[in-house]
């Protein structure tokens, strides 16, 4: 009986150690996906964006409007804005099992209609481990003035 109890304790401890390593690994994956999203957005790469956004994603823009994935991809494709920089100033990832929350501040610089612009926004992206991949299921951006 003692042997079974000791084995159970050791298995739980091993599981906790694996979970901690797993969280760090997941955080790295989510950071890489956030970088991919920023680069794809900057270069209007709708194929790359399509691969990381869940079909049911809810996108809440910095003006409060809501878009579906289809609407978002169409707006990226049709935009006449030329993003010169899309870079996080701060990024934090919290892992909760098969869900990861990425939050931070994003700085965007570009030109639209011949006029330069700079904006900063606080964002929260919710990522879900679905099958073999992580996909974003919700995103919210709030302007920082």
Region locations from a protein language model:
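A beta-strand edge to alpha-helix "cap/lid" segment located at domain peripheries
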Residues: 20-52, 56-145
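Bacterial N-terminal signal peptides
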Residues: 4-15
